Design a protein with these regions (language model features):
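Active-site helix-to-loop segments that bind/position phosphate- or nucleotide-bearing substrates
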Residues: 11-245
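N-terminal assembly/transducer modules of large multi-domain enzymes
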Residues: 1-14
C-alpha cells in the first residue's frame, strides 16, 4: 500500500503475515531495482589487490573435495573469479571487483575499510534473557572479521569450542567420548544461511547469541519469502551469486 501524501518510504507499507509493516530503505530498492542484485554490483574504490589469495586457495581446496574434476579448477585465478561473478570486465579491458568478490574473498583490512559491518559478533549471555542493563548484559563478546569463505569455519569453531560437551561410553568400549550437545553440521548450516541470506545494505553485523539454554543467530534484513509460504519448498535468494559459491 502507498499513501502519496506521506511520500517515500514513510508512506509505503508491505504485507507481512496478517499485518502491514512500514517499508524500509531496502524495500524501496527492491521495488525499483534493476536486473542486478546487490552481490553483482561493482564495489567503489576496490580492485583485484583486495582479494585474499588464501581465501581463493581455500575455495579451490573445498571445491576439489566436493568434485575433483570440477571445470573451474582448471581456470587461472582471474578466470575463476570471473566465472564466480566475483569480478566484472570493464570497458577499459580491466576488471572491477563485485560485492561477491569482496565479501567472499576479500582481505580482512579491505572488508574493514569498505564494509565495516560485515562481521560476526559472538555474544555469550549469562542466563536466559537479554538484559536491558548494558553494563551487565554480556558475559563474553568476540567479534570476528574476514572473508565469508574463511569465516564460516572460524565462527563455527568459536561456538563449538565454547559449548559444554556430553559424555558417552559405548558398550564394549574402553574409550569414552565427549560429543558436543549441538551437531557441528547443524550449526554450520545455520551460520552459512545467516551469511547468504543477510542484507548487506543494512549496516549491522551477524550476531550469534549464546544463552544458557539456547543459541540464537540474527542476521540483518528480513525474509524475502512471505511468512505464509515459510513451510513450502524453495527459497528466495537475496544474494544469488554468493549462494551459488
Amino acid at each position: 500500500a502507498y499513501f502519496a501524501k506521506r511520500g517515500l518510504p514513510e508512506g509505503a507499507f508491505r504485507r507481512i503475515g496478517p499485518s502491514d509493516e512500514k517499508c524500509s530503505e531496502e524495500d524501496m530498492y527492491l521495488f525499483y531495482q534493476s536486473a542486478d542484485t546487490y552481490d553483482s554490483c561493482i564495489v567503489d574504490d576496490a580492485d583485484l589487490d583486495d582479494i585474499d589469495e588464501n581465501a581463493l586457495n581455500f575455495y579451490r581446496k573445498l571445491r576439489k573435495e566436493v568434485n575433483p574434476d570440477a571445470e573451474e579448477l582448471t581456470l587461472n585465478d582471474v578466470d575463476l573469479l570471473r566465472a564466480l561473478g566475483a569480478i566484472k570486465k570493464n570497458k577499459q579491458g580491466g576488471y572491477d571487483l563485485t560485492y561477491t568478490g569482496l565479501l567472499v574473498f576479500g582481505k580482512q583490512m579491505s572488508l574493514r575499510r569498505l564494509v565495516p559491518s560485515f562481521r560476526v559478533d559472538y555474544i555469550r549471555i549469562s542466563g536466559n534473557q537479554w538484559l536491558a542493563d548494558g553494563d551487565n548484559r554480556f558475559e563474553q563478546t568476540i567479534d570476528m572479521r574476514g572473508p565469508l569463505i574463511l569465516m564460516v569455519n572460524k565462527a563455527c569453531s568459536a561456538v563449538m569450542d565454547d559449548l559444554p560437551k556430553g559424555f558417552e561410553l559405548k558398550k564394549d568400549s574402553m574409550q569414552a567420548s565427549t560429543p558436543a550437545i549441538l551437531p557441528n553440521k547443524v550449526l554450520r548450516e545455520a551460520i552459512v544461511n545467516s551469511y547468504i541470506h543477510r542484507s548487506n545494505r543494512v549496516n549491522q553485523p551477524i550476531q550469534i547469541i549464546r544463552y544458557s539454554n539456547r543459541i540464537e543467530i540474527h542476521n540483518p534484513g528480513y525474509s524475502l519469502k512471505p511468512q505464509d509460504d515459510w513451510g513450502e519448498p524453495g527459497s528466495m535468494l537475496r544474494n544469488p551469486r554468493i549462494s551459488e559459491i
